[in-house]
Amino acid sequence: MEEFRKEIVFESQNLERETKLTIFGSYGFILLAFPLVGDEYDEQVDCRFVEGVSDYIKNGIFRIVYVPTIENRIWKNGDKSLEERSGLHFKYNSFLVDEVLPKIFKMAGSPTPIITFGCGESGYFAGNSFFRHPDLFYGTILIDAFFDIRRLCGDYFDTNCYFNSPLDFLPKLEEEYWLIHLRTRKHIYLCVDEKDGFSVSQATQLSQILNNKSIKHTFEKYNISSENKFDIWSHIFFDIVKRYF
């Protein structure tokens, strides 16, 4: 896939460092992917997901754009207080909306549909980004994700944490502007390995909330005979892409 790969390197004002977007493909809608390990695209892990859908990329169905995340640099940074980490998460949201999306639209030549994607902890960032901004994103593919920010912040919980915790803010969401966007999105996928009790519980809670809000979505449990998380996640990802795209 190297012939379809390019990078956009830039200085982020919100993250206060140089960062980059890793892009595969030249045409189609955008699959905004959050790295599975670490905060950056990983050649050994993330590449298997790219290779597995290479035909879709080559045929211009979609492009995959890997965006940096903040799990390790911010939430697992013991040198900063939890209040500071929460504040940096706020800046990360601004980074996505004010810096990443304009660069993606410029690359595409116009505003283009964007679906977020992530597994495990990266699934939290993919899901949170979508549910916070359903007016900007067209859907999300979430595999073994969690939706309660307490998984990152522990007992610390401020207003910013609340608005970055879908299991907390979605039940109380009443504004029609956001609900209309959520109810018209056709690509919301909650997928779990049924052997992962925590992920099943998180997805079940979120699915119940979405049902209560009349938000259509697909909730699927998989039984895959493997103990390797990356094998399980890639199997589920390929299945969703094959069946729905």
PLM feature segments, named:
Residues 1-245:
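Non-catalytic cap/lid and distal C-terminal segments of serine-dependent acyl enzymes
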